[in-house]
């Protein structure tokens, strides 16, 4: 990631204000980190000579040894400085140097009268050194910073052992996690690439679940500063996660089992994403679902906090769903093409009557208007009205009329006594409440109730004579073509 991109993305997430709160134990190199940060990326980008000189004068002092150098919180520079990164990109940068948490072996937080009292921007009266460290850390991160940087050490930069830093380090991390701002940790070491330092870096990263970088703060380069900002950027919260399902899954109905399974997997997995850093880990979890072959990170907008994930389904699942939807097993491309031709023909026929079907279900009567292809035009005929002539054009088109008729079917077996009849009713109704459709599968005299009822309905439908059907059709034609609304029916 380029330098400009890093600053641009962080500026978007912080509203253009890059305020780094540098916290940690005493004698870890916090002031040195701030000084190098300013010298490498801030001072060279300040165009105004006077502002650059003022910022240079405000750099903190640092020195080796056990004596504490920073005895009060300090803003560097005192007022946020506008830094020109590139065309159209100006950011406000300020760092805050905190009073560190005390550690055994450090000198300067006590004097001959006991705990050293220091001045802070938050209280009018001086407060003890250790209290200023606790209050300052929380206030700096919560009120004066957009990003937190914890500086710790492996003990190689001075005369204080690594073990003396652990308690203060844990307290700082605990404070920062309570505040909830994005932060990272830097291990200040004179041997940042040593296997022991690398092992320590990995241990701390797992212990605190944060990114940890190892570097020599004293010899820090611009690339190291950008690495800190880049890692901090991935600690910002995710604002939106877009998950793209396979395109063919998206065309399934909302209540289809596979689409619901995909949606449930997304809900279950995405809920673990809190930070931008979590996205990569969560992408791998999608592969645990049997209906997801793989998942990939399609893109991530660091400045917007938006991540996009693509999900891919196995090929055999497509074949399975196709068989389920079509109703037959697809034997090959030729078979699929044959089916598509049949379905296309069926759809064309259905489209002509679909509106009529909806109408007949709602009102009991439906009309399917004829298509242009169904219309036939008679030969034009010249007509005369008095002294004037005209042309008669006559077209004939078949319209389909649907009538919903409720057919009654009754089955009343005489089986014996009243008690036997009650037992039959009880047998028929035993599963009705749990599954109303189960009554049709009830066995009566060796046959299912559904087959008995269906047979009765079919018998009634076949009773309508041919001449009655013809007369009904003829009657409808006269009503429609002659516009007569009156109808008298005599059923014999």
UniProtKB/Swiss-Prot annotation:
Binding site for ATP: 24-31
Keyword presence, Transferase: no
Family annotation (SUPFAM superfamilies): P-loop containing nucleoside triphosphate hydrolases (SSF52540)
Keywords: ATP-binding, Cytoplasm, Hydrolase, Nucleotide-binding, Sporulation
Outcome of mutating residue 210 to A: Defective in germination
Outcome (variant: residue 210 to M): Altered cortex and coat formation
Location in or out of the cell: Cytoplasm
Record bears the keyword Manganese: no
Pfam families: SpoIVA_ATPase (PF09547), SpoIVA_C (PF20439), SpoIVA_middle (PF20438)
Effect seen on changing residue 70 to A: 500-fold decrease in sporulation efficiency. 5-log decrease in sporulation efficiency; no ATPase activity, but no change in ATP-binding ability; unable to polymerize and fails to promote coat assembly
Outcome recorded upon mutating residue 453 to G: Altered cortex and coat formation, affects localization to the forespore
Mutagenesis / variant outcome for changing residue 30 to A: 20-fold reduction in sporulation efficiency. Largely enriched at the forespore periphery, although some localization to the cytosol. Binding of ATP reduced over 23-fold. Leads to diminished ATP hydrolysis
Coiled-coil regions, chain positions: none
Catalytic activity: ATP + H2O = ADP + phosphate + H(+)
BP terms from Gene Ontology: peptidoglycan metabolic process; protein complex oligomerization; protein polymerization; spore germination; spore wall assembly; spore wall biogenesis; sporulation; sporulation resulting in formation of a cellular spore
Effect of residue 256 to P: Defective in germination
CDD domains: Ras_like_GTPase (cd00882)
InterPro entries membership: P-loop_NTPase, SpoIVA_ATPase, SpoIVA_C, SpoIVA_middle, Spore_IV_A
Positions occupied by motif Walker A motif: 24-31
UniProt PTM comment: Seems to be cleaved by the YabG protease.
Role, per record: ATPase. Has a role at an early stage in the morphogenesis of the spore coat outer layers. Its ATP hydrolysis is required for proper assembly of the spore coat. Forms a basement layer around the outside surface of the forespore and self-assembles irreversibly into higher order structures by binding and hydrolyzing ATP thus creating a durable and stable platform upon which thereafter morphogenesis of the coat can take place. Required for proper localization of spore coat protein CotE and sporulation-specific proteins including SpoVM.
Subunit structure: Polymerizes to self-assemble into static filaments. ATP hydrolysis is required by every subunit for incorporation into the growing polymer by inducing a conformational change that drives polymerization of a nucleotide-free filament. Polymerization requires a critical concentration of the protein and only occurs after it is localized to the surface of the developing spore. Interacts (via extreme C-terminus Gly-486) with SpoVM (via Ile-6). Interacts (via full-length) with SpoVID (via C-terminus 499-575 AA). Interacts with SafA.
Domain notes: Extreme C-terminal region (AA 487-492) is required for its proper localization into a spherical shell around the developing forespore. N-terminus (AA 1-64) is functionally important although largely dispensable for proper localization.
Name used for this protein in its record: Stage IV sporulation protein A
Organism: Bacillus subtilis (strain 168)
């Amino acid at each position: 990631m380029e330098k400009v991109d890093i600053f641009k993305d962080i500026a978007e997430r912080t509203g253009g204000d890059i305020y780094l709160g540098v916290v940690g134990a005493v004698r870890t190199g916090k002031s040195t980190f701030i000084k190098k940060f300013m010298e490498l990326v801030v001072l060279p980008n300040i165009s105004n000579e006077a502002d650059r000189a003022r910022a240079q004068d405000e750099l903190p002092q640092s020195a080796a040894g056990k004596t504490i150098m920073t005895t009060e919180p300090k803003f560097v520079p005192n007022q946020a400085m506008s830094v020109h990164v590139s065309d159209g990109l100006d950011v406000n940068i300020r760092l805050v140097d905190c009073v560190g948490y005390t550690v055994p072996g450090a000198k300067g937080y006590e004097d001959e009268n006991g705990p050293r009292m220091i001045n802070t921007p938050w209280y009018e009266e001086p407060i003890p050194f250790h209290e200023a460290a606790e209050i300052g850390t929380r206030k700096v991160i919560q009120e004066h910073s957009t990003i937190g940087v914890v500086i710790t050490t492996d003990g190689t930069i001075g005369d204080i052992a690594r073990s003396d830093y652990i308690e203060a380090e844990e307290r700082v991390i605990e404070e920062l996690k309570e505040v909830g701002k994005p932060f990272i940790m830097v291990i200040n070491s004179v041997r940042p690439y040593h296997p022991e330092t690398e092992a320590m870096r990995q241990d701390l990263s797992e212990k605190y679940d944060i990114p940890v970088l190892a570097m020599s703060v004293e010899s820090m380069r611009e690339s190291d500063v950008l690495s800190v900002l880049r890692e901090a950027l991935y600690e910002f919260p995710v604002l939106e996660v877009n998950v793209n399902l396979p395109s063919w899954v998206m065309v399934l109905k909302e209540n289809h089992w596979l689409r619901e399974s995909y949606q449930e997997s997304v809900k279950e997995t995405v809920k673990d994403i809190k930070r931008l850093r979590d996205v990569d880990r969560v992408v791998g979890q999608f592969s645990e679902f049997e209906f997801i072959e793989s998942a990939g990170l399609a893109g991530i907008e660091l400045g917007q906090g938006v991540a996009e994930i693509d999900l891919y389904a196995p090929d055999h699942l497509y074949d399975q769903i196709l068989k389920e939807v079509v109703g037959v097993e697809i034997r090959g491309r030729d078979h699929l093409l044959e089916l598509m031709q049949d379905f296309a023909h069926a759809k064309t026929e259905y489209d002509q009557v679909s509106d009529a079907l909806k109408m007949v279900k709602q009102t009991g009567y439906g009309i399917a208007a004829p298509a242009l292809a169904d219309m036939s035009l008679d030969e034009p005929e010249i007509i005369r009205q008095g002294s004037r002539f005209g042309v008669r054009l006559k077209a004939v088109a078949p319209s389909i009329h649907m009538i919903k008729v409720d057919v009654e079917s009754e089955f009343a077996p005489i089986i014996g006594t009243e008690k036997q009849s009650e037992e039959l009713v009880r047998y028929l109704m035993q599963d009705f409440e749990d599954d109303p459709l189960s009554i049709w599968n009830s066995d009566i005299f060796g046959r299912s109730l559904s087959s008995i009822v269906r047979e009765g309905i079919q018998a009634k439908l076949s009773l309508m004579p041919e001449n009655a059907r013809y007369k009904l059709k003829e009657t409808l034609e006269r009503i429609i073509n002659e516009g007569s609304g009156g109808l008298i029916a005599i059923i014999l």
